[in-house]
Amino acid sequence: MPFKDQLFLASQYLAPHHLVSRLMGRVADCRAPEIKNRMIARFVRRYNVDMSEALVEDPLAYASFNDFFTRALKPDARPLDDEPGAALCPADGAISQIGAIDNGRIFQAKGHSFGLTDLLGGDAERAAPFAGGQFATIYLSPRDYHRVHMPLAGTLREMVHVPGRLFSVNPLTARSVPELFARNERVACLFDTEHGPMALVLVGAMIVASIETVWAGLVTPHKRQVRSVRYDAAARAPIHLDKGAEMGRFKLGSTVIVLFGPKRLRWLDLPSVRGPVRMGETLALPASTAISFPESE
């Protein structure tokens, strides 16, 4: 491994993850024009951000860097595929891994996997509906659209905030940090859908200031304990989201992991798999009509 990679990995273990992220979050929320305009302009140049898709095309018109980063797109920028029964890609990004949940483990990178139960906060009963099911890991790069949408119409059953570290998420850390996605702070949202159980897990990372959902707003840490909120209780009004509807967003984003139960859906075998994807593209079809995807390597 090159020395610079070793140095970067060492810094990941030594850095005060949450302190750095809180400081970056405050800077990203700054509304002083001389600060936020410089940050936004440099970001657009560095990452070649396509503002023609944004509802507000002028990057300097946003009140803060975070407002720019979580910008809305024009209504026709991400048309939804209309294949009956299809599950859509929930976000812009790149599929880093996709396949079957094998013996309660999810593939991370060569030589590394992580536990399904650990990912969902350590509750075996919560994880059981996804045993033997399917997963897809979608990485959102800095230039991507950072809102997350529903692959299927669903009724929210539970939201789980799992505290943890905030390692950077990239190919190097995926190859080198054991159980990366089950160690980083994350928010798991569990839904009931026409194809059975579905989970969307929004994984934080270094300098990810916050994760929001459309029903709860900003999801903030609660000490060091897993916090679960049930939405299927009689005391709460049901929350139902349509297919393609926004369900959450990253302020300085990271990764979305999609989980489905067994024998319901199969991933579509397309050139885009393990490569760039866009929100609204078909990601999976009912098991009776799709081609199974080969095992992760």
Curated annotation (Swiss-Prot):
Active site per the UniProt annotation: D92, H149, S254
Residues bearing PTM Pyruvic acid (Ser): S254
GO molecular function per UniProt: phosphatidylserine decarboxylase activity
Bilayer disposition of the protein: Peripheral membrane protein
A Pfam family the protein falls into: PS_Dcarbxylase
Keywords annotated in UniProt: Cell membrane, Decarboxylase, Lipid biosynthesis, Lipid metabolism, Lyase, Membrane, Phospholipid biosynthesis, Phospholipid metabolism, Pyruvate, Zymogen
Function comment: Catalyzes the formation of phosphatidylethanolamine (PtdEtn) from phosphatidylserine (PtdSer).
Complex and partners: Heterodimer of a large membrane-associated beta subunit and a small pyruvoyl-containing alpha subunit.
Name of protein: Phosphatidylserine decarboxylase proenzyme
